[in-house]
Each structure stands twice: as C-alpha cells, then as structure tokens.
Amino acid sequence: MSKANAKYSFVDLFAGIGGFHAALAATGGVCEYAVEIDREAAAVYERNWNKPALGDITDDANDEGVTLRGYDGPIDVLTGGFPCQPFSKSGAQHGMAETRGTLFWNIARIIEEREPTVLILENVRNLVGPRHRHEWLTIIETLRFFGYEVSGAPAIFSPHLLPAWMGGTPQVRERVFITATLVPERMRDERIPRTETGEIDAEAIGPKPVATMNDRFPIKKGGTELFHPGDRKSGWNLLTSGIIREGDPEPSNVDLRLTETETLWIDAWDDLESTIRRATGRPLEGFPYWADSWTDFRELSRLVVIRGFQAPEREVVGDRKRYVARTDMPEGFVPASVTRPAIDETLPAWKQSHLRRNYDFFERHFAEVVAWAYRWGVYTDLFPASRRKLEWQAQDAPRLWDTVMHFRPSGIRAKRPTYLPALVAITQTSIVGPLERRLSPRETARLQGLPEWFDFGEQRAAATYKQMGNGVNVGVVRHILREHVRRDRALLKLTPAGQRIINAVLADEPDATVGALGAAE
C-alpha cells in the first residue's frame, strides 16, 4: 500500500463473519475489537481474521461503562450492521420497540464515550420507511448530539450498481448506510444544525448522502461510457460474471440439485410458457399466473372435483428419476367453451386486477391450459398451492429453464439471469435454471464480495447461507467508505486520526481488492 503503508484502527460491531472487516482491511484498517453474539458466525470470523469476536455487546457497552475487552486506544472508524430483523421485509415488522432494536443504544454508548472519528452504520431499506420515521430521526439526532456531521438523508446503495472493476456483484441488495464524521468541538456550533430554539435539528439534511441508487459509474476504469446493470450487452450476466465458475469443487455439506417435485414444477410451468409462446408468438406477460383462479371457471372446477387430473408418471432420466408429462388425455376432456365468473368487487383493487388478467388469460387459452394441467397433474397433491402460481418477470427469456428462479410463498418467481435479488437469511436460495441447481455457499460468498480464500470450515451449509443473507457486501462497504472520506476530506484533514484515514482509504484505486490480503494480519 502506498503512503507509507498507512493504517487506521477500527472496531467491528455486530461483526457477523466479517464483511466490514474484509472491506476495511483492504484499505489499511486494523481491527482492534470485534463482537458477534452468534456462535457460528463468530467462529468463522475468528477463523478468517485471527480475531476473537464471540461476545455480547451489552456486556462491553452499557450503563456501567465501555470496556471493549480491554482495548482503550483510539477508534478511527466504527462499523456496525446493527440487527436488521425488526426492520426487514424478510420478516415481521415490529420496529425498534423490540428488545434487540434497542441495541443501537449500546452503539451510542461507545460513540459517546470513545468518540470514533468516522462512523459507518448499516441497516435494511425499511429503516427509512414511513413506519420507522421516528427511529430514523432519533438516530440522526443522537449522532448530531454527540458532535457528528451526518446527512439527514440516507445513503441507499446496492452492489449491482457497481461495475465489477469497482467491486460490484450481480445482486440487488438495497441497504441504508449512515456515515458520519466527528466535528472538532470548536466547529460544532457552525457544523451541527439546530432549530431556532437551539435544539438539535434532526430533520435538516446537512451534507448530501455519500451514495444513491441513481449513481452510475464507468463500465471500464478510466472510461466514459456508463455502466447500466440491466443493459443486455454491457450489464450484468450472472453466468459470465465470475460468480459461477467451472471446476468449482462440489460442496460436501449440501446437495445443490433440485428434487423430483421441484423439477416437476419447473418442467410444468416451462411447458405452459412454451405452449403459449407457440400459440401467440409472444412470451408470457409480466403478471402473476394463478392456476387456482382458473378453477373459478365452473367447467374446470367440475374436472377438479371429479378428480379428472392424475399425477404424471416417473421415468429414469440420466442418473435420476423425473416426472414426465402424461399423453393419455381422454377425448373430449377439454370443454368446448367456458363461462367467465364474476369478480367480487369487495376484494382489494390489486387482487381484482390480478383476477381480471388471469380470467382474460384463461378465456383466451382455456384449451391449451386444461390440456397442460392434465399433462402435468397440476391439480393434484404434487402441486401445493404456492407452486400453482408463477410470477413471470423474465421478459423475453426463451424458457423458464433459462431464468433464475425462487420458490416463494407467493409462487415461483422467474427473472432473467442478469442480477439476483438480495440474499436473505431464510430458505429462498436462488435456482440457476441453465444449471438446474441452486447457488452454492461459495457462490453466495462471491456475491457478497468475499475473497476466494475465505474459509467457512466444516459448518452446516444452512449456517453459511444464513450468514451470507445477514452480511454486508464487501465492495459496497469499500465504496461507501471511500465516498465518505472523499466527501468529508476537508473535515478529516483537521485531525491526526482523520489524516490517517485519508492516507489509507484514498491511497489506492477501488480495484485494489481484499483478495490480495492473507487471512492473517
């Protein structure tokens, strides 16, 4: 690293497996304290960073004081992805009133007593939604009260916005970042916004956020053409992005292959998409297809009631058994016409709209749909209700098997294989259609920007998936830190700690990756 191998100190709160650590270590950061309450995540952290992390922040920062396991030196940068579950769309929304939500105040105790020079806090997108307006303003007010210059507008960013040379990965993962710089005490009256009555003004915007979802960057280093993530020619392509690599060893602790019934569901919907494409010359439209709504037509309902649909047969295909479509549909099984049902006008508008489009679709294609449902046994126990739904968001992808899919409670969602939706800490692992398998734990680690040498040991694959779903993206953190230092450079120059941070973080171009580091520091 240039500039005399500049270094700065940081503490890593709610550290997980070390996403913040990976980003900061790549720019000269030296971790002095890390804390993570999850035993499995803390073990992975220590395995890779040679730094004990297992512990409870409430033991180290509370009303009695701040100990940080004996570290009493300067803190140049404080990072923390404080617990997201109360705010996340992936789970029930209960807000900061939940016990773990109050852990922000343990962060605040460290900030109050130790006065880190720079703060980088991360949370889910919902933190800045209308349901959490009070919590957001409380956080901003607290930081300003402690003497920090912080934007009142959130920095919202996602790794798919960055081209690969800047550390981007093909994953839409919108996260909120709160970045702040400690203002020298003599300057606080002019830098910290206050109301006319002299109180801290939490609603004032202050400096601009360091990143937004509208930011765009050059496709190539030094170039002028901008990178657009969804562009068909120059945007992301999951299959050629480097996330999926030929020759990767097969993981020993997880079977990535699809089950027979999972393959059946995809084969069936793939057949319907192909059937409609042949009939119309167009792919499916982009709305949710609900097979159960078609049974509102009395002609199809009668066939379901009399158990006219049977499960398809299984045959050996390659080295595995696979369901194959039936070819024995009785003559006259398909009705000559269908009767459109009325829509209950008391239903929510969105549901009426979906039903109307499904009824239109079935009226136009009932002959093809009934024959399709017979071939695959769609109205049998092989298809639970959630698998009788398809959310086609793949535009003109040639086949369902050419998409990236997710099995969700709302149905099978299909997207073009450009970039993936956010990894989550629950069981919605992406299915890569062209490979007929799920993403591997190693591939999810690449999506989060972790280096190839990063080692999860022999832990359960489910634990790795969970950790990746809870983690921060390394490239995004590095970008956020760099942009923060650029924005606040004049303020940081005023202190020795700030100068250390500038010299380290701005020493190298953003393509200097953590992969050059060894696991030991």
Swiss-Prot record:
| Example GO biological process | DNA restriction-modification system
Any idea where the SAM-dependent MTase C5-type domain is?
A: 8-491
Which residues are catalytic? 84
- What GO MF annotations does this protein's record show? DNA (cytosine-5-)-methyltransferase activity; DNA binding
Pfam families linked to this entry = DNA_methylase (PF00145)
In the Enzyme Commission scheme, what number(s) does this protein have?
2.1.1.37
Extract the InterPro entries matched here: C5-MTase (IPR050750), C5_DNA_meth_AS (IPR018117), C5_MeTfrase (IPR001525), SAM-dependent_MTases_sf (IPR029063)
Top EC class of this enzyme: transferase
Catalysed conversion reaction: a 2'-deoxycytidine in DNA + S-adenosyl-L-methionine = a 5-methyl-2'-deoxycytidine in DNA + S-adenosyl-L-homocysteine + H(+)
* PANTHER family cross-referenced by the UniProt entry: TRNA (CYTOSINE(38)-C(5))-METHYLTRANSFERASE
Q: Which family does it belong to?
A: Belongs to the class I-like SAM-binding methyltransferase superfamily. C5-methyltransferase family.
Query: What's written under domain?
Result: Replacement of residues 191-272 by a single Ser residue still protects DNA against digestion by AluI.
- In Swiss-Prot or TrEMBL terms, this protein is called Type II methyltransferase M.AluI
